[in-house]
Amino acid sequence: MNSNIKKWAVSLSAIALLCGISVLPIVNFDLQASAWEDYELVTSGTDGNFSFSIQDGKATLTDYTGSDAIVTIPEAVGTTTKTTPSKTVSVPVTALEQTFYNNSNITSVTIPDGVTTIGYNTFTYCDNLKTVSHGKQLQSIGESAFSSCSALESFSFQEGLLTIANDAFSNCTSLKSVTLPNSLTTLGESAFQNDSALESVQFGNGIAEVSAHAFESCSSLTSITFSEGIQRIRENAFADCSALKKLTLPNSLTQIDSKAFCAIHSETSLRSISFGSGLQEIGPYAFAFHTKLAGILTLPEQLTTIGDYAFSGCSSVTQLQFPNGLQSIQKGAFQNCSELRAISLPNTVTTLGESAFENCNNVKNLSLSGSLTELPNLAFYGCGISDLCIPDSVTQIGVETFSNCSSLSAVQLSRNLKTISHSAFYNCEELKSISFPTGLETIGEAAFAQTALGSISLPDTLTELGQAAFYNIPQLKFAKIPGSLKTIPRSAFYNCYGLNAVELQEGIEIIEESAFANASLRSLILPDSIIEIGDAAFQGVDYLSTIQLGSNLQLIGSKAFLLQSDTLCSLYVPESVISIGEKAIGYWAEFEWNTPTVGSHFILYGESGSEAQDYAKSNSISFLTKSEPGLTKYYDAATGITVFAPDSGLQMQISVSDSQKLEPDPGYTFQGWYQIQFTKNGNNYTPAFLQVQIPMEQNVRRCTVFINRLNGFYTEIYYPQNGSIDFTTTKDAFQLDVCKQLLGDVNDDGTVTLADLIMLQKYMLYNGTLLAPENADLNQDTACNGFDLLYLKRTLFPSIG
């Protein structure tokens, strides 16, 4: 075949010469390149101001040496063959590559129809290039082809264009609009990044993905028109598009990647988002830091995953509408959404990430998914919720999960809860009540420190309590600690200034350093199981007048019972004690800076030759070798009150009046002003202290005791145990007020009002907490249900019938 072509060409040339026509061997590359293999084309060279390379019979212009401002790209370049260097072969130009790189002269270029590819760095840094005219056969615009053409104001993307590569038009800071054709199927990374004048983008329907960084930092972009067919928007695709106010996403979109619309480095204008119905996943930081995104954010029905910090810092969003199919809300997803008012998680949510709603400080209502098994670290840190109901599916509360929720006043814990982690409710300064479920095993460090709990009863399943777990709760009056807890840790109840009663059950072995320091215990009974009391365990305790140590105690740390007041008159130390630390017993100091002194009437009891005797001798403390001093029981039949005094042979009389009546607190009923008088051999006698036991009716929930001191009254709250309250005092007069059960008073304010009805109704909807759950069984059928709600409605509104 090649031989025939040669013969044809030679014959044609001969005819032309006979006719007097000058002919150059022009190559028509519509023919196969192999037809010209004998010519051995020279594949690189120059033609005028252009350098070129040839491959497969097509020319690529690789350089331009001219200085013209207006340039027209030639349709073809001439080359020769190695065997016939005098012959010129015309080769069509189909591509440009690095042709005008860093050319500051060119302002306008015309590209012929035959060019299908504008390749790598073709016009990069042509900072005066304003207009580009190209043919309809253009299929590909290569990497950085027009990058940093800062004067380029427009570009016509015509049908037939298939590919725009990475950085193709990045840093084109004068480009104002982009309309992509339907033929375009590939849009490269950073294709239009940093085009600061770009105002509008319209996608054709051939694009399935918007690539990473494609329009990042297009700071003037106000309009994006997405076509149906786009399925994914890659990371940072529209990040820092600070002028964008409204966003409407197509129904075809299923995935939005990391930081796709994130306001990373700039102020934001985005105010609303309309999500398409097909969206399934929102990636990390996808819409983070849009501070003007406001109002209701409605998430689409197909959405299953919200990524890390996806809407973090969207501080103007007030309401979230989650779809029922949502499964995962990841770390920090709505962190710092400070105007958010409520959170209602559908039961399909099984995973909640750390800090998911951290610092949403205006959230008042929280409804958790019934499928969650763990509430992670910092999930609701600093939120404004007032009451909390944790579903029974939850077994673990993480570190600082509800820390600094300053309005949280009541919590209903999961009945299957096993672990409350470090600082879980730290500094919830309004938290007044909580009921710990049976089955709870661990309470972490500072878990309830600086709350306002009034009473705690720890379940007998608890085996681990963290340091400072109940640190600095001045409102705490009573604590019950089970024997399942072998160690009461360091500072567990430190600075609980109001703690006047503690029940320590058999099984506890160690009380660590400062565990009850600065409490206000009146009496202390330690179980026989305790073998060690740490340094300063009860240091600074005020008003403590009686202590009963366990029979197996071995170690008493230094300053263990260095008290704040001179109220302890005696103490029996069992023979089992083998070590007593410095100033551990018998000393008191009103303030920390005062030098401790031995109590003015203190006597230490113990066995001869015991550690107690050695301690007494070395500290110049009075010591008596005898068994533990007993208390004498005195009973008043008229009142039913039993009093124990450290003296025998006394006569007791108790009088009740209302002469010094103080106004009871709301919800309390005045019972009387009680005066206890003792005589001995006909003369008035005042024992060093009294242990008072007052019987209580079954429906009494708690009592307030007002005791008169020289500097005024002080108040203690007691909860009946086994049908009575018990307290120790050095005074002989007190006022007693009682708070009885009031059916319907579920908010525990002493009255039954509409507020109780609202609280009970929220509780029934599994979205609330009862402050006094024992008052919820209005029809006395031993269950709290809809009948009780109806009963309360009829009580408040008889017309309901």
Identify the meaning behind each predicted range:
Residues V23-V27, V738-G801:
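Cellulosome-associated attachment modules in secreted, modular CAZymes
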Residues G66, C383, A519, T625-L631, ...:
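Short domain-boundary/entry signatures in modular proteins, especially
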Residues V23-S51, D56-K58, G801:
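Low-complexity, acidic Ser/Thr/Pro-rich repeat tracts that form intrinsically disordered stalk/linker regions
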Residues W8, N49-F50, I54-G57, G66-T94, ...:
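Structural signature of tandem-repeat unit edges
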Residues L662-T704, R709:
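Proteolytic processing hotspots in large secreted/extracellular or virion-associated proteins
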Residues T99, G119-T122, G142-A145, A165-A168, ...:
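Consensus positions within tandem repeat domains that build extended binding/scaffold surfaces
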Residues N4-V27:
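Sec-dependent N-terminal signal peptides of Gram-positive bacterial secreted proteins and lipoproteins
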Residues E628-G640, G682, R709-L742:
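Proteolytic cleavage junctions
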